[in-house]
Amino acid sequence: MNKLALYCRIGFEKEVAAEITDTAAERGVFGFARIQENAGYVIFECYQPGEADRLAREIPFTQLIFARQLVVVSDLLQNLPTTDRITPILQKYQEVSPHLKLQQSSELWVETADTNEAKELSAFCRKFTVPLRQALKKQGWLNFKQIKDSGMTLHCLFVRSDACYAGYSYNRNHSPYFMGIPRLKFPTEAPSRSTLKLEEAILTFIPREEESKRLNENMIGVDLGACPGGWTYQLVKRGLFVYAVDHGKMAASLHETGRIEHCSEDGFKFQPPKRKKADWLVCDMVEQPGRIVALIGKWLSNEWCHETIFNLKLPMKKRYTEVRRCLQKLADELTQSGLKFRMQAKHLYHDREEITVHVRTWRH
């Protein structure tokens, strides 16, 4: 098993390929990406044995922008007999078991890519999971009961009913969600579906145990381009008082909470009220990414807030290059301002032609 499978949104295979190629090269690992347009995944094949496993351990999954999941995989197992698909899969795992501690595996995910064609396999995958899990357990695998983060998950990525990649991921360095997709339910009281973007961002960027410390009723938030209030809703739900900045109308349900002040202003010109620095800034404005980065840089450099989640709308071409350029520009500005910071960006499931960025700053 010397390949990586990286799941993604369809149409972003080239960005995933460019990112994993660059990230691997930074660690002295070289290979080539196999891209199939609109496949919903990319296969990165390493030149040297053992390097896919090394990348799966060493590349911080949280620093990959466009990948939803990171899995070490076998060659594609093709022409699996319909009467016995399990034996060839078991054989692949048995080949690597001498130098891989499969006894530390805790879960099995039989998955497909997130495409309409692949989803037709989802019913098959659910049914196949049970007998495959039983067969793997008979080998002494999938019984790991210790701290989940220290084990591994076994994956079978089916591309057809008779073809799959068998592999594994490290629990401490992967997406904890099946297919790399968090299943969020749209709250009926939210003003717009965009609310799911911020909910997923909070889930992705802020550890669950820290959420109540980092987002609570003692804090002030600013939402630039707030109308009708999908993102404001997520902050208000967590107790923040929010300055909702937009010329458009906010949902009446948010006014009724008493936790917002609607500022009918241009988001690019708004500044926080004097002596009331915001704790949080959120922004989901449809604007060129360069302008948004300059705006966020101004807020953070002036210390008008110390934590932010914002979206960057991507151009039609050279999306990966533009993302790298924008994030580097923001990082340079924060460094020149003498701020320490942590920055993370992700192409979330609820994002489309955009990525979501989280930045937290401090002085010491």
UniProtKB/Swiss-Prot annotation:
InterPro entries: RlmM_FDX, RlmM_THUMP-like, RNA_MeTrfase_FtsJ_dom, rRNA_MeTrfase_M, SAM-dependent_MTases_sf. PANTHER family: RIBOSOMAL RNA LARGE SUBUNIT METHYLTRANSFERASE M, RIBOSOMAL RNA METHYLTRANSFERASE FTSJ DOMAIN-CONTAINING PROTEIN. It is an enzyme of class 2 (transferase). It comes from the Bacteria. Monomer. The active site is at K313 (proton acceptor). GO terms for biological process: methylation; rRNA processing. The keyword Transferase applies. HAMAP family: 23SrRNA_methyltr_M (MF_01551). It is found in: Cytoplasm. One of its GO terms (molecular function) is S-adenosylmethionine-dependent methyltransferase activity. This is Ribosomal RNA large subunit methyltransferase M.
